Amino acid sequence: MEHFDIAIVGGGPAGLTAAIYARRAGRSVLLLEKEGFGGQIASSPRVENFPGLMSVSGAELADRLYNQAEALGARLELEEVLEVRDGPCKTVITDYGTYTCSALILATGMKHRTLGLPGEDTMAGISFCAVCDGSFYQGKDVAVCGGGNTALQDALFLADLCRHVTVIHRRSAFRGDPVLVQALQKRTNVSFAMDTVVTALLGGGVLTGLSLRNTVTGAETSLAVSGLFEAVGQLPETSLSAALTPVDAGGFIPCGEDCVTSAAGVFAAGDCRAKEVRQLTTACADGAVAALAACNYCKCI
């Protein structure tokens, strides 16, 4: 059973930054990621709010973080963590093996919130990633559901590929950046369904349309689309932390700006921890803070 000074669960910006800082401090580091390094930012078509980079694709930024952590000597593994156990040494059990560590950083991020409609999990034509799946709908009509920056960015990306994009939002105004809204309003192949919710997915095994309801008038309509891209928020991915530290009512891990949890030797970084602002830069900042706190913990045991 291999032992590391610090194990990090989650390979997004917070986890990769933590790996960089911990390795620079001379600690042995294991980072475990179950899906793809870089987290959700890796699927973003453009990142324009990262200091020092005017514009970069999410995939390129993810590659840069990964390559830096790897070059510094962090052990980076694509393994799903199934269980974590507390103790003088933490035990991390994955689908490939078991590891121990002196300090554990939880940087598990968030997962997509769904609409909760019948057929959503099995029907072809439902996606949470415009960059990943947009090319499948070239020249077709699609819908984007959501009102934040992710939904607006997805709609802009899809407008370059698809015949028509309908943006569906349950409120009367978008929550995303005004500059994105203005960019969408200039597109001739984009329309908006405001104060509107999706009530049903139409089609057998393949999506052919949506049933919609206006939340103000109650009017019900249908919209023919080949694809639905959901961007309706996220939920913290904190099921693993239950064995180590409690979560708050929203499912987030409570800890201060020092990223120290209530469990000795356990730290939280990025979107999974309770905080006011969740951005790429704050995730990286959390990773640095958590790594330094974990290094200090290792010095004291």
Residue map of PLM features:
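Glycine-rich dinucleotide-binding loop and its adjacent helix/turn
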Residues: M110-N149, Q153-A155, A159-L161, P254-G256
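Beta1-alpha1 glycine-rich phosphate/pyrophosphate-binding loop at the start
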Residues: F4-L72, L152-D177
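FAD-site-proximal beta/loop scaffold in flavoenzymes
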Residues: R24, D121-F136, E230-Q279, D286-V289, ...
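Residue-level detector of alpha-helix initiation sites
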Residues: G12-P13, G36, M110-H112, G148-T150, ...
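Glycine/small-residue-rich loop that forms an oxyanion/phosphate-binding "nest" at active or ligand-binding sites
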Residues: L76-F136
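Internal hydrophobic alpha-helix adjacent to the cofactor/substrate pocket in enzyme cavities
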Residues: L156, R163-H164, A283-I301
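A Rossmann-like FAD-binding core segment of flavoenzymes
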Residues: A69-I93, T98-T100, D160-G256, N296-C300
